[in-house]
């Protein structure tokens, strides 16, 4: 087994298959207590350092627990500061968001150790952002080239999960760094998997219904939203309906973006699953549905956790702890790179 260290690991969703390919994450760090608790449930043999890596005491704990035989560093700093779904969409706001400088804490861990392989993963827009470095503003690739080119091969890519056997469109920024003399090819692209291929075999469910299949239970939605979505076809937003329009309790029509209150499409990969995938009115969250005999559309609901596991490339019977709520599980999945994508990226590295 190759030993690894994981920073900003959240609940460890992205690490689900690493042990199967010979990578043992022996040390992890995460800020949020609930995510740490989830990680410990999923990976009881890994040591979790809980706390903010910017805190020197926490950082020193991480450094003290790195024994020197760890070959891989994985760093997936939080992306809220650069996500297109957040409020910060330009360089000025990026500069003022402290979350975007967590990469320098990862760099400090790299500088004080001797890893053979380093993976930095983030949202695709991370590639175009610039950081203050030696009196200049440089992108992360140029910073890494300046610091590490003598010892490492450094590559950057924007890879989309849909090209690697995952039924979800999810572009991610990947920076790979590996010692000269090692090899780490980029995995080959595969055919896309549609939503129909991924979850079309599962039984129809309406709001609140339980199929009896592991976590294939529909969330409860209010009757107003259900009515609007039963009159909305796949790929369409209920906000475009002329009559059956989403409304508040007081009857006022709800306003939103073109991709809110919107059904997914059967014959395309799923849109990227966000931390808010349990909200029927949020971005591209509603099941594609099936047209019924009366002309209405079934499955007026968000995807179930079972469906979400499949879309996220998690095991269908992923062992989530009993205390974890539906929304918390969705949040952890929405924060993470799909684990099958991580598996395929790491599977190509060689000594």
Regions found by a protein language model. Name each.
Residues 2-113, 123-135:
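Core alpha/beta nucleotide-donor-binding catalytic domains of modification enzymes
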Residues 7, 28, 99, 137, ...:
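Aromatic-acidic/polar surface patches that form glycan- and anion
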Residues 12, 33, 78-80, 124-125, ...:
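Short, solvent-exposed loop/turn segments at secondary-structure junctions
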Residues 33-36, 138-142, 305:
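Short, surface-exposed alpha-helical segments at coil->helix boundaries
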Residues 62-67, 82-260:
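Class I S-adenosyl-L-methionine
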Residues 223-351:
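C-terminal target-recognition/interaction regions appended to catalytic cores
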């Amino acid at each position: 087994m190759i030993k690894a260290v994981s920073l900003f690991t959240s609940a460890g969703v992205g690490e689900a298959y690493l042990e199967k390919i010979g990578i043992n994450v022996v040390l992890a760090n995460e800020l949020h207590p609930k995510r740490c608790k989830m990680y410990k449930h999923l990976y009881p043999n890994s040591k979790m350092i809980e706390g903010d890596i910017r805190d020197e005491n926490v950082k020193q704990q991480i450094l003290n627990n790195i024994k020197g035989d760890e070959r891989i560093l994985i760093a997936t700093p939080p992306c809220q500061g650069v996500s297109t779904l957040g409020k910060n969409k330009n360089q000025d706001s990026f500069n003022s968001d402290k979350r975007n400088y967590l990469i320098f804490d990862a760099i400090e861990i790299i500088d004080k150790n001797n890893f053979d392989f380093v993976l930095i993963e983030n949202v695709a827009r991370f590639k175009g952002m610039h950081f203050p470095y030696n009196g200049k503003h440089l992108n992360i690739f140029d910073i890494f080239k300046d610091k590490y080119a003598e010892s490492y091969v450094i590559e950057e890519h924007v890879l989309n999960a849909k090209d690697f056997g995952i039924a979800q469109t999810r572009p991610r920024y990947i920076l790979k760094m590996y010692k000269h003399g090692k090899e780490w090819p980029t995995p080959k692209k595969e055919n896309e998997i549609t939503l129909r291929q991924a979850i079309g075999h599962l039984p129809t469910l309406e709001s609140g219904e339980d199929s009896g299949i592991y976590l294939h239970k529909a969330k409860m939605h209010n009757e107003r939203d259900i009515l609007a979505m039963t009159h909305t076809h796949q790929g369409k937003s209920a906000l475009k309906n002329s009559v059956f329009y989403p409304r508040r309790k007081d009857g006022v029509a709800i306003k939103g973006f073109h991709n809110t209150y919107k059904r997914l499409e059967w014959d395309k990969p799923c849109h990227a699953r966000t931390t808010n995938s349990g909200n029927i009115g949020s971005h591209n969250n509603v099941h594609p549905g099936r047209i019924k005999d009366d002309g209405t559309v079934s499955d007026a609901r968000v995807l179930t956790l079972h469906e979400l596991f499949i879309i996220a490339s998690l095991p269908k019977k992923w062992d989530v702890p009993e205390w974890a709520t539906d929304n918390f599980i969705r949040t952890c999945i929405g924060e993470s790179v799909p684990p099958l994508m991580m598996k395929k990226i790491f599977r190509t590295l060689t000594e």
